[in-house]
Each structure stands twice: as C-alpha cells, then as structure tokens.
C-alpha cells in the first residue's frame, strides 16, 4: 500500500511553502515571477487532481453530439479522440452544420468545456460569477 502523497498533493505543499515561507523573503523585483510560479504550480496540481475524468466527460459529451464516432477505434488515446472531435466541432461550427436542432446541445457542450477549463485555470472566477 502506498500512503505517500501524490503529485497533486506534493505540488500543493510546495506552493504553500513558496507562498507562506519563501515569497515574503524574495526581493520585490522577483515577487511577480515567484507568484507566477506559485500559480503555475496550483494549476498543475488541479490538472493532476482532475486526471482523465474531465477528458472522459468531454468525450462522453462529444459522442452524445456525434454518436460513437471513434470511441471504438484502437490505438487512439482519450486525449487524441477528444482533440480530433474538437477539431471536427470547430469545423462544423464554422460551417454552420450544427445550427438549428443541434445548436442547444452545442451551447451546452461549449459551456461545459469552458467551465471545466476554468475549474483548472481560474476556479475563483467561476465562484465570483456564480457558476460554481
């Protein structure tokens, strides 16, 4: 049994040490860079915590829109499938293929994608605007 902290936890601890113990002693001309490092560590920790869960959810939503396209293809990772379907989605949005009956589903998908990305990159914003 492995009781060691995982990568996300290690990043959170390192970020806390940086912010609480090291940052106060850093020269003013290096504070901005240190804060950027701390923020990058927080984003990386949230990405690790989310793992592939967000990707699987995004794939599920894309396959609801397009059917089981690519789901059974061997050799493609979930990440590759999501990337390919998102390219198709962008092309279809630009061409107007998804206007009409699909428009509501496309809006829901795009909103979910943006929320998932904001949960990782800027979760405080989601709370500030009442989306979480």
Description of each model-found segment:
Residues 1, 5, 31, 76:
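Charge-dense, low-complexity intrinsically disordered segments
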Residues 1-16:
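An acidic intrinsically disordered interaction segment
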Residues 6, 10, 33-36, 81:
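Secondary-structure capping and boundary motifs in well-ordered enzyme cores
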Residues 10, 14, 21, 59-132:
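C-terminal amphipathic alpha-helical interaction region
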Residues 16-52:
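N-terminal interaction modules that seed assembly of large macromolecular complexes
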Residues 47-64:
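Short, charged early-sequence alpha-helical segments and their helix-coil boundaries
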């Amino acid at each position: 049994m492995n009781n060691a902290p995982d990568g996300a936890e290690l990043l959170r601890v390192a970020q806390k040490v940086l912010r609480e113990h090291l940052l106060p002693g850093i020269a003013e001309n290096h504070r901005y860079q240190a804060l950027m490092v701390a923020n990058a560590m927080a984003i990386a920790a949230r990405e690790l915590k989310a793992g592939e869960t967000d990707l699987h959810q995004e794939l599920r939503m894309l396959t609801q829109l397009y059917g089981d396209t690519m789901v059974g293809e061997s050799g493609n990772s979930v990440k590759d499938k999501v990337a390919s379907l998102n390219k198709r989605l962008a092309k279809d949005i630009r061409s107007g293929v998804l206007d009409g009956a699909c428009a509501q589903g496309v809006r829901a998908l795009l909103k979910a994608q943006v929320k998932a990305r904001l949960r990782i990159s800027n979760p405080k914003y989601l709370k500030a605007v009442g989306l979480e």
